[in-house]
């Protein structure tokens, strides 16, 4: 499949029960996403074209600390930096843009064989690393030998890439372990930076990449300072210095209001109203963002063994109330009980979104005519608004006779605590998991993978196994329209079986000072770029 530029999207009106006006929401017919008009988001001065000004320093509050960041030795490595936003210093073969489309970066073109398991990638020949060395095919091969290494590598490449080889001065060939018709998106993953060739155990430690900024200073666990890469191959950078602050227990909002920060890289939606009233402040809201996943463990004695109870819980949840109350009708979106992001062209809306009468009927059929009390639902504060989201959700299901107690757990060790242990002495818990927006193949694979078992033991089993078979078929299918039909079938299966519930999605929101230009919110918080950002 060759890369193609996206075609302009048409717009159509979308009716919502939240009472929002036509002007407040528009939705792309092909993408299915909701976006605010620019007039609602940006200060009037920011909408005008201006010539970028070079120089200056920008400080932003880091929002998602990298749990693997622990030592000075590895602090510049793309796997172990202070944050998972590696785009400042490293380039990947591709980039996923603000509309979740895959676009060229180090790679200029890519093409798969008919079986979708061999990909040939052409790379740019005008890129230099920070130390002046040219970026070559040999560096791409060496980088992916690291990424796919069983002990040293990163999960996406380890599971997918079998072999990588040079086939020309500007061409590399990937042999995949299994077919993947959307491999171009995998090449954009944030850890899969291209680094100078070296022994695998040494690669990445120097921090030398080909990105728009270079490492200047790292304060482990607290902050990192970057300086402009004057040899950058693309547009920009315009800033002289970029600083990310990620202090333990810091208050980003107070830091912003006191002048510490120029940018809040991830905003609590409850603060949008306050920030809109803050002088010389602009807000940008991405087309999508993370979802809140409810894992429904299915084992002997669990109420979720009964599909009717899973269906009832999904139908009882008032997702529109969450969007209206927590996200102000603007910074949230309705999930469809799959990992799919609503921005994607292959997204299949859930209909009906809520049906309390049907939920009560299903509970009665399952033997609970007077309602049901579910096990405690656990969560950790992955996003600032999570308690508010779950409080509204727990209140909403009472209308169907469902009682659901919620309990917050500390972030430290949460994922290990909520999943089954290696000895299988503990089952997966009825708990929340975060889900980032990616392409359909990555999104839908997560309900098929055994890791962390987000499907809650849905497979092995007839419908779960059928789902996996459909996924494998989609990965062998090169034609996007034929693949869409398969994706729709997979989503219909998920909406019928409800192996997991996706409560709602948030739209990644950033706030910044009005003298900051060229900055756009990104649905993947790890893909936010400062390459073309400048200060007036």
Where are the regions a protein language model picked out?
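Structural transition elements
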Residues: 300, 331-365, 381-389
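Surface-exposed binding/hinge segments that line
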Residues: 122, 155-197, 217
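N-terminal lobe/hinge region of extracytoplasmic solute-binding protein
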Residues: 61-114, 145, 206-209
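Ligand-site clamp/hinge motif
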Residues: 230-274, 403
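Long beta-strand-rich cores associated with HINT superfamily self-processing modules
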Residues: 512-536
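Gly/Pro-rich hinge or "lid" segments in bacterial periplasmic/extracellular proteins
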Residues: 79, 84, 97-101, 185-241, ...
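N-terminal secretory signal peptides
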Residues: 1-20, 24, 31, 45-46
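Extracytoplasmic/peripheral linker and loop segments enriched in polar/acidic and small residues
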Residues: 162, 399, 403-415, 443-514, ...
């Amino acid at each position: 499949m060759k890369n193609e530029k996206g075609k302009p999207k048409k717009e159509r009106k979308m009716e919502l029960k939240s009472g929002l006006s036509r002007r407040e929401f528009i939705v792309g017919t092909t993408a299915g996403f909701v976006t605010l008009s620019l007039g609602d988001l940006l200060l009037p001065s920011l909408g005008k074209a201006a010539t970028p000004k070079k120089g200056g320093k920008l400080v932003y509050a880091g929002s998602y600390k990298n749990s693997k960041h622990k030592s000075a030795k590895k602090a510049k490595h793309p796997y172990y930096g202070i944050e998972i936003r590696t785009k400042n210093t490293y380039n990947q073969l591709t980039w996923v843009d603000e509309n979740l489309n895959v676009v060229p970066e180090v790679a200029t073109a890519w093409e798969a064989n008919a079986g979708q398991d061999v990909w040939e990638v052409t790379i740019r020949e005008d890129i230099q690393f920070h130390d002046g060395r040219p970026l070559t095919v040999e560096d791409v091969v060496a980088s992916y030998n690291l990424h796919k290494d069983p002990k040293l590598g990163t999960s996406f490449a380890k599971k997918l890439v079998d072999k990588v080889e040079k086939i020309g001065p500007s061409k590399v060939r990937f042999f995949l372990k299994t077919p993947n018709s959307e491999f171009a998106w995998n090449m954009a993953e944030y850890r899969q930076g291209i680094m100078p060739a070296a022994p695998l155990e040494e690669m990445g430690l120097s921090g030398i990449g080909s990105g728009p900024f270079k490492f200047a200073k790292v304060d482990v666990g607290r902050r990192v300072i970057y300086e402009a890469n004057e040899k950058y191959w693309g547009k920009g950078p315009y800033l002289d210095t970029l600083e990310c602050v990620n202090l333990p227990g810091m208050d980003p909002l107070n830091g912003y209001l006191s002048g510490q920060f120029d940018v809040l890289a991830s905003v609590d939606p409850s603060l949008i109203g306050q920030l809109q009233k803050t002088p010389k402040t602009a807000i940008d809201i991405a087309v999508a963002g993370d979802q809140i996943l409810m894992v429904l463990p299915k084992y002997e004695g669990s109420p979720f063994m009964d599909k009717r109870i899973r269906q009832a819980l999904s139908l009882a949840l008032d997702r529109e109330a969450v969007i209206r109350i927590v996200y102000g009708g603007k910074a949230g979106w309705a999930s469809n009980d799959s990992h799919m992001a609503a921005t994607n062209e292959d997204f299949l809306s859930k209909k009906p979104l809520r049906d309390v009468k049907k939920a009560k009927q299903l509970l009665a059929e399952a033997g609970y005519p007077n309602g049901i009390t579910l096990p405690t639902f656990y969560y950790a504060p992955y996003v600032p608004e999570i308690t508010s989201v779950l409080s509204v959700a727990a209140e909403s299901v009472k209308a169907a006779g469902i009682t659901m107690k919620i309990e917050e757990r500390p972030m430290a060790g949460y994922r290990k605590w909520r999943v089954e242990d290696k000895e299988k002495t503990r089952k997966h818990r009825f708990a929340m998991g975060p889900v980032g927006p990616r392409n359909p193949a990555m999104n839908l694979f997560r309900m098929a993978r055994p890791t962390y078992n987000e499907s809650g033991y849905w497979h092995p089993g007839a419908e779960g196994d059928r789902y996996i078979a459909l996924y494998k078929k989609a990965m062998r299918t090169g034609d996007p329209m034929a693949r869409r039909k398969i994706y729709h079938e997979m989503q219909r299966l998920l909406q019928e079986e409800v192996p997991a519930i996706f409560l709602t999605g948030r739209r990644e929101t950033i706030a910044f000072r009005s003298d900051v230009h060229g900055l756009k919110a990104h649905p993947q918080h790890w893909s936010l770029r400062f390459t073309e950002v400048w200060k007036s």
